[in-house]
Amino acid sequence: MKNLEKRRSRYLQDSPPTRLGGLAANLGRIASFSKYADHLEIVDSVMQESKWFIEWTASDFDILQAAELVKLQVQLALWQLQSKNRWDEESWRLELAADSKQ
């Protein structure tokens, strides 16, 4: 938990646009790593980190932007759950890769 608090403190030092850039970079990582069957743990970790980023930063945006971030957070949680049962399906991973770029 201490490490998570350090990460949160460090993350919140960045400006909101920089934080959104970090989130966008994570979505790109999800897209890239999802193409490979042996990267489940990496993708899961990046999804979890992205959900935390949203949790920590959504309140710094107006209500409509925050709602979009929360919508993305829910999508990330859904992908995480689905990945546990469908990761071995290449077609699902490729769909995840495509969807995470949008």
Regions found by a protein language model. Name each.
Residues 1-102:
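Surface-exposed peri-terminal alpha-helical interaction modules
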